[in-house]
Amino acid sequence: MPAGPGSSLILVVEGEWRARQSLVGEFQLAGWDILQAATGEDAIARIRDVGDWMEIVFTDIELPGRLNGWDVADAARALYPELPIIYVSSRATEVLRQVPDSHFFRKPCKASDILAACVRFQRLGYGRPERRSVH
């Protein structure tokens, strides 16, 4: 699957329904294909179901359920080490954890900034299935 809006798949993991729907709407308007998850458990299941077609994972750090956004990222990276992750959190201390091939936003943040980070990852070739190692 080639990279580019309209053919790029992003997983949006956000526990707050309104925030998730707002972001999903922005991504869809920009031409992205979207998968959604409200919990870490659901996100990990979707990552496993889709396989390496996913190009980017966007996750809130604070999620309902047992697993948080760090757990989602760890599971995604265990399967696809080069998969870009975009993190968001309302806690300033979360930014202290540096993760390669990732970007951190502090809430509140603009959807346009998140979209711009996704486009930067694409332009650099991150997240493209053909770039990843087979596991």
What are these regions (language model features)?
Residues 31-41, 46:
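Short hydrophobic/Thr-rich beta-strand motif most characteristic of the beta2 strand and flanking loop
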Residues 60-61:
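Active-site residues of response regulator receiver
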Residues 13-14, 37, 57:
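Conserved sequence signature across two-component system core domains
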Residues 1-24, 48, 52-53, 82, ...:
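Non-catalytic signal-transmission and effector/linker regions of two-component phosphorelay proteins
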Residues 70-82:
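Short amphipathic alpha-helix used as the core "switch/output" element in two-component signaling
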Residues 88-89:
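Hydrophobic/aromatic residues positioned on beta-strands within the core alpha/beta folds
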Residues 39, 67-72:
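Acidic catalytic/metal-coordinating carboxylates
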